[in-house]
């Protein structure tokens, strides 16, 4: 049977996305127990290979593996032979020789997980590749959204922030539109990818134009580590024009929810009052991330494609 990977959502059918989400439901029940561990992946080894800094995603994958009783080996770029000039290809061969059963890769170069998947005969999970994709984040966002809004068809969801540099935005757009979500994007023109409207989304320059009737708002941070100079006048001006505050949130439906993939820059893209408000489901996203990643590990290592 061919090795199954999770490299991106751009070409993934809705049925396959749904398979991950459905398998996350029993995983969430497991992590709600006092004793969270089950023996499902006992004897399996998961290697997390992170060439970029990460707190939430790395911890989420580690916990997902541990709750399923898999062993984990955590490798950061600073502690690996990459600092000595070792290529990803050679690292891949080493991982394969050591007997890993699955590799989770985060890398600054778009396409790196695809390259790794061609080199080794074990499942590869893309934990973020450059500005390209972050599929498990989109899966957990979709899972959270369905918990709060079971009928996604026609739901208006507004994404506000640095769309240009966001792999989260790309994966979410591909996933959400497959389930009939009406996706609207808000960003300064300099922070929008060229031709983004061709992805079946509606683009706005001002939050005030997009937020009315929205049932969900997803806020993205300014990725200043990836930006070139001059894309925005300054951070304060951006916060004034695009930050999600209580006044802007009031334009949405009374039951609208607020999402953020983290890390948050409070007072810039999102106000304290909104991030800590009753409509925010940000902590739900974190919890659901573990359940979704448990489902991913299970399906890729033990599950079978219909």
Swiss-Prot record:
Instruction: Tell me the residue numbers annotated for binding carbamoyl phosphate.
Output: 56-57, 106, 134, 137, 262-263
Q: What catalytic activity does the UniProt entry give for this protein?
A: carbamoyl phosphate + L-aspartate = N-carbamoyl-L-aspartate + phosphate + H(+)
InterPro entries assigned? Asp/Orn_carbamoyltranf_P-bd (IPR006132), Asp/Orn_carbamoylTrfase (IPR006130), Asp/Orn_carbamoylTrfase_sf (IPR036901), Asp_carbamoyltransf (IPR002082), Asp_carbamoyltransf_Asp/Orn-bd (IPR006131)
Q: Name one Pfam family in it.
A: OTCace
Molecular functions per Gene Ontology: amino acid binding; aspartate carbamoyltransferase activity
Q: Which GO terms describe its cellular component?
A: cytosol
| Pathway membership, UniProt | Pyrimidine metabolism; UMP biosynthesis via de novo pathway; (S)-dihydroorotate from bicarbonate: step 2/3
Enumerate the Gene Ontology biological process terms: 'de novo' pyrimidine nucleobase biosynthetic process; 'de novo' UMP biosynthetic process; amino acid metabolic process
Q: What is its EC number?
A: 2.1.3.2
UniProt keywords (A-Z) are: Pyrimidine biosynthesis, Transferase
- Record-annotated residues binding L-aspartate? 84, 167, 221
* Taxonomy, superkingdom: Bacteria
Concerning PROSITE patterns, the annotation shows: CARBAMOYLTRANSFERASE
Subunit relationships:
Heterododecamer (2C3:3R2) of six catalytic PyrB chains organized as two trimers (C3), and six regulatory PyrI chains organized as three dimers (R2).
Q: Which NCBIfam families match?
A: asp_carb_tr (TIGR00670), PRK00856.1 (NF002032)
Which family does the similarity line name?
Belongs to the aspartate/ornithine carbamoyltransferase superfamily. ATCase family.
Function per UniProt:
Catalyzes the condensation of carbamoyl phosphate and aspartate to form carbamoyl aspartate and inorganic phosphate, the committed step in the de novo pyrimidine nucleotide biosynthesis pathway.
Q: What is this protein called?
A: Aspartate carbamoyltransferase catalytic subunit
Give the gene that encodes this protein.
pyrB
